[in-house]
């Protein structure tokens, strides 16, 4: 079958239908300015040879296992579209739970405040900026009049920080979200000690012996963002070791972790002296997020 039209490319590809349509739709949009609906409305129009060559390269990349998100350089996350590349993890649906939890916490604070709130949030291991930017975007769309928020994203990778900056600019969020290259807390300004209402993190938590590291998309993602090369809990220990220095009294920390790590992470939260420790399930019922709260300087019952 000659490869000359959208339909002929889709009919002849060994890729599954979903991947093929995402990749080809992206290519038509980028190369010809066609909307995704052109996969149907223009399925018989002759395509330029240059586009067909690009398609064959994308097709081959996917057949070799390269993630679709890296091939098109985009990934949707919690209502926003992010630029992604192999220097950062591909944002996943389960990480959206961290954003939802943060929104829940912020709404609770708004409910109990009779004035405009000013909140500062720290996203440790920000990668593409997914958590920081999704949270800032959600707040922008809802509670602008009752809340002023500042979000700080931290990552040890300079390439990740560059990409996160680009995403902030593309989403028009660079006025409320800033990114700092830092190995966890190392380069955070001292004047921010004790100033964060929320600390969020999706740290490297996969055990280095886990065979999944050699399967699927994980083969192509940055290993340092997946595993601590220890036991899957070392980065969580490092985060918890200093979290009380940076949290405000009554501030909350929320950590994503593996489906079988909840009990261990709760134990670490308790060891760090945090209160109200609990785990939250993902949509499949697996406990994937654990949280703890710093004790307030003044007990809530004694506040006026």
Region spans (language model):
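Conserved Class I SAM-dependent methyltransferase catalytic core
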Residues: 230-293
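Conserved AdoMet
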Residues: 26, 30-105
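Conserved SAM/SAH cofactor-binding pocket of Class I
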Residues: 97-212
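Non-catalytic nucleic-acid substrate-recognition regions in nucleic-acid-modifying enzymes
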Residues: 1-21
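Conserved beta-strand segments of alpha/beta enzyme cores
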Residues: 81, 150, 176-178, 275-278
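C-terminal lobe and adjacent flexible extensions of AdoMet/dcAdoMet transferase-like proteins
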Residues: 289-304
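Residue-level signal for inorganic ion chemistry
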Residues: 23, 27, 65, 95, ...
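Mobile active-site "lid"/loop adjacent to the S-adenosyl-L-methionine
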Residues: 204-235
């Amino acid at each position: 079958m000659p490869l000359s039209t959208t339909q002929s490319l889709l009919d002849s590809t060994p890729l599954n239908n979903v991947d093929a349509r995402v990749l080809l739709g992206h290519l038509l949009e980028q190369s010809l300015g066609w909307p995704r609906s052109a996969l149907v409305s223009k399925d018989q129009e002759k395509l330029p040879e240059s586009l067909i060559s690009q398609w064959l390269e994308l097709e081959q990349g996917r057949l070799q296992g390269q993630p679709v998100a890296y091939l098109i350089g985009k990934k949707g996350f919690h209502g926003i579209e992010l630029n992604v590349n192999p220097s950062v993890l591909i944002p996943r649906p389960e990480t959206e739970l961290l954003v939802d939890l943060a929104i829940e916490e912020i709404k609770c604070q708004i409910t109990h405040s009779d004035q405009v709130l000013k909140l500062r949030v720290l996203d440790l291991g920000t990668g593409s900026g997914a958590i920081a930017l999704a949270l800032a975007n959600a707040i922008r769309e809802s509670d602008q009049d009752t809340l002023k928020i500042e979000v700080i994203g931290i990552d040890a990778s300079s390439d990740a920080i560059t990409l996160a900056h680009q995403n902030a600019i593309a989403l028009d969020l660079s006025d409320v979200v800033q990114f700092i290259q830092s190995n966890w807390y190392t380069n955070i300004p001292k004047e921010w000690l004790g100033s964060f209402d929320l600390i969020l993190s999706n740290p490297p938590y996969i055990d280095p012996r886990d065979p999944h590291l050699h399967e699927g998309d994980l083969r192509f993602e940055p290993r340092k963002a997946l595993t601590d090369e220890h036991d899957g809990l070392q980065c969580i220990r490092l985060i918890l070791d200093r979290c009380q220095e940076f949290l405000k009294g009554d501030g909350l920390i929320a950590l994503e972790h593996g489906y079988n790590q909840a009990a261990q992470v709760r134990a670490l939260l308790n060891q760090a002296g945090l209160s109200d420790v609990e785990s939250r399930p993902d949509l499949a019922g697996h406990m994937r997020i654990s949280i703890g709260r710093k004790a307030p300087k003044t007990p809530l019952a004694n506040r006026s």
